[in-house]
Every structure is written in C-alpha cells, then in structure tokens.
Amino acid sequence: MAVKDVKKVVLAYSGGLDTSVILRWLQTTYGCEVVTFTADLGQGEELEPARKKAEMFGVKEIFVEDLRETFVKDFVFPMFRANTLYEGQYLLGTSIARPLIAQRQIEIAEAVGADAVAHGATGKGNDQVRFELAYYALKPDVTVISPWREWDLTSRTRLLAFAEEHQIPIAKDKRGEAPFSVDANLLHSSSEGKLLEDPAVAPDEIVFQRTISPEAAPDVATEIAIDFVSGDPVALNGVTLSPATLLARLNELGKANGIGRLDLVENRFVGMKSRGIYETPGGTILLAAHRSMETITLDREAGHLKDSLMPRYAELIYNGFWFSPERRMLQALIDESQHSVTGRVRLKLYKGNVICVGRESPHSLYDTRVVTFEDDEGAYNQSDALGFIKLNALRLRLGAQIGRRGGAL
C-alpha cells in the first residue's frame, strides 16, 4: 500500500520517546489519521501522560486499556507452566507481551476501520518480528508500517533532534540524562543501550528499577508459601489472589530481597548478539516454586520429556511464533502435564536467592515408605535391583567384550 493510500493507522503507543516521535512522523509523512493504543500491562507508569501526549498531537481516537489480568492469566502463566527460559536464563518478559499487544491492536484496527497498523520496534531488534508475525497470523492482509525501517532517523541522536524540533517532551533519568532503552510490564523490566552496549562494562546501580541490590537486602530471610492448582499459582500465604495481583505481590517480595537480576548477552532472532539488564523479581520466585511443585507431582519420564521440549517452546516465544500451530501443539502437551501439579510450596527469599524449604501435594508421587532408610515393611524389595542392573549392563558388557577383541565400542 502506497503512502497516499493509508488513511488511518493504529499505532502501538507507549507514550515514550520512540513512539511519540513515530506518532508525529506518521502524521507528517503519511498525512493520515493516527489512532493510538496503549496497553497497561503493569509497566508501573501512570498512563495518563500517554493519553495527554496523544491529545497534544491532535489524536481523536485514543485507546488506553488495562490488560494486566489477561496478560498474566493467558500469556504469562501458560508460559510458566513450561518453566520457560530462553538460552537457559531469560524469562521472556518482553517476548511474551508482544502477542497480546498485537492481538488487541488488530482488534482495534478492525473496529475503527483502520487500513494499517504501526509499531515502534527498531529494524535491528526482535520486536519488529514478534509484532509483525502476530499481525499476519491474525490478519493476513494487514498493512504494516515500521517507521524504523523507513525513515532517516537512524540513531538516538537524530531521534532526539526530531523530538526537539517538534516539541516532543523528552524524559530524563535520575541524572538528568536521556534514559536507557527500557521495556517494562508486570513480569519484568529491561534496560539496553548507552554504556550497556559494552558487555565488559558493569551496570551502574542506577540502571536497576525493579530490585534492590542483594547486598542491600535484609539480613533475615522472608518466608512465603505459594499454592498451585493445575500448574498455576492461585494463592500467596494462604490468601487467594487474582493472577495479576499475585504476580504484583511476588514482585514486591522479590524486589525487597534483591531477587531477579540478570545481566545477559543473548542471541537475537535477527542474527546479532545483544546485551540487556533484566529484572524479573516475581517471575524468578514463581519459576523456582513451580519447578519445586513439579518435582513431587510429575512422573519422571513425563517431566524429562517436558524439560527436553522447553528450549524449543522458549525459542518459539522469543522469536515471535506465539500464534503458530507448533506453539499451540506444545502448549497442549505442556498443559496436559499440569493436571496433577497442585499443592503448596514453601520458600525462603534471601539476598537474591530463592530457596525451597518444603513442598506438599495431594497428588505427590513421593512415597516415604518406599524411599525411607528405615524399615520399609516390604514396600520395596531391594533384591529386585539385581536383575534391573544386569539388564541395563548387558549392552555395556557386550561392548566391552568387543573392545577387548580390538573392535569399536
């Protein structure tokens, strides 16, 4: 679709520097009506300034929606049922938010009769892929505008100059400087850019927004209990809470105990490596609790199969394939494994650490009678192990015999 053919576009709008510049750029370059959509995913910011900024630039249709419960219930919790970590470390706080934003953006575009959607992701990052794969999965004929791939504002310096020229307010950090590139929601916050672009440079404490330093955390552990039903957390310290409220409370506890910091160099889907500082206090606690719950409720082979599939599942979410058939297939398998993951986990939070100190479940596969060092009263016949060992040793013995005759093992 040519520039002149775009009459109305729905912009995923945070109210930050990038999307505020994009809003004005769309108006001046495309000459089209811009509809803004701001999703409240628990980023912890007052969203009214985003509305006022949009009004300042003459936007008539402004959508600001509270999606926190939907975000946690339908996106975060399903992901945590899989104990999802990208490259063994990243809890996917940014990745998991994009499908929901894109989904609602497409719904709004159809409702207001827009002929295009736009986002503020750069041409170097993963988010452009995540947004657009979701757009096309939900509306195959959608027109997508990606300003970072079109305009000549190819650096933060040029972006700031454009903002000053068009009188776009520029946020400052605590030192009065332009802020890091930040993404935040109820699950996490991330910081990138500036001095963090050098992976050898340690981040200043000012970078961290969601956690205190573990060194500054209390000298006494905080003890908590999390209740699970079918793989999802439902209560904290015996009090039933909504998904978003529970995660928010875990964030508070994690923050106070210095939990959830990660300095990560990751492999982006587009091919380059990038460095980010991630803070996921509540998610780090939740992951430890869920894994502990599974240790007594999942069958060994079922658990090992699930663990073997997790990296692929994580990769699909990281790369933007939330709405793909393969992600849905894996989700069905993961959810099937969670029917018995019900019970209570007790944890200690201490100076950046999450320590499981107890777990119990009505579906526990842990049988004290079988595993005890004391008299098991015939629950387990130790002599049965002889045949088990001999059968498992058979191929090793045969291989060793061949090896002695000069053959290959």
UniProtKB/Swiss-Prot annotation:
One of its GO terms (cellular component) is cytoplasm. GO terms for biological process: argininosuccinate metabolic process; L-arginine biosynthetic process; urea cycle. Gene3D superfamilies: Argininosuccinate synthetase, chain A, domain 2, HUPs, Single helix bin. It holds the Pfam family Arginosuc_synth. CDD domains: ASS. ATP binds at residues 12-20, 39, 120. Its main location: cytoplasm. One of its GO terms (molecular function) is argininosuccinate synthase activity. It comes from the Bacteria. Its EC number is 6.3.4.5. L-aspartate binds at residues 122, 126-127. It is found in: Cytoplasm. L-citrulline binds at residues 90, 95, 126, 130, 181, 190, 266, 278. InterPro entries: Arginosuc_syn_C, Arginosuc_syn_N, Arginosuc_synth, Arginosuc_synth_CS, Arginosuc_synth_type_1_subfam, AS_cat/multimer_dom_body, Rossmann-like_a/b/a_fold. The keyword Nucleotide-binding applies. It catalyses: L-citrulline + L-aspartate + ATP = 2-(N(omega)-L-arginino)succinate + AMP + diphosphate + H(+). Pathway: Amino-acid biosynthesis; L-arginine biosynthesis; L-arginine from L-ornithine and carbamoyl phosphate: step 2/3. Disulfide bonds: none annotated. Keywords: Amino-acid biosynthesis, Arginine biosynthesis, ATP-binding, Cytoplasm, Ligase, Nucleotide-binding. PANTHER family: ARGININOSUCCINATE SYNTHASE (PTHR11587:SF2). Belongs to the argininosuccinate synthase family. Type 1 subfamily. Homotetramer. This is Argininosuccinate synthase.
